[in-house]
């Protein structure tokens, strides 16, 4: 029984290593190096090449993050889900004023080109919006969902 379990465990380790290696097989080594420098404490990295961009989903301090790199191994964008109470106070004040009574969900903090903004889904009684908010509280409607 112990030999069977040991053999199974060894096979599992080999398969896991092969899967990890194959997940990185298509990723440019420059991008892997840039990622390891930028996010040295990241865990559970999952890679996907999408056209000219390479996307990596990973955990950083137990929080899910997505990052995109261009073909020059430059970090283009990062995104992570956050809670309503993690929004800047100026954004919360504007949301409470302009969308009083709405439910907010799907809140994502995005960093792109040295700019931070927040994408927020606002559900009112009969309307749904995808909003974009700047840290200063300026909000625009990106899309009316219903």
Task: Give residue ranges: language-model regions.
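Bacterial Sec-dependent N-terminal signal peptides
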Residues: 1-25, 35
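Interaction-mediating elements
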Residues: 22-146
